Amino acid sequence: MSAFKLPDTSQSQLISTAELAKIISYKSQTIRKWLCQDKLPEGLPRPKQINGRHYWLRKDVLDFIDTFSVRESL
């Protein structure tokens, strides 16, 4: 038996700009504009850049959504 636990690979660990746009209900270009102007919403983590494209960690985005939804309910 191995002491290592393999991650769940059924979902990608990374979220593209287009996927993030669908999740937070904004257009992809709006997110690109925020990145260009360095004006990401408070709490949204900076993306990783891979081959010139921006990718967010799924865990970070889910944490942002959880935090955002808690704030709105207050």
Swiss-Prot record:
This is Protein YkgV. InterPro entries: DNA-bd_dom_put_sf, EF_Hand_1_Ca_BS, HTH_17. Induction: Expressed at low, approximately equal levels in exponential and stationary phases (at protein level). PROSITE patterns: EF_HAND_1. Pfam families: HTH_17.
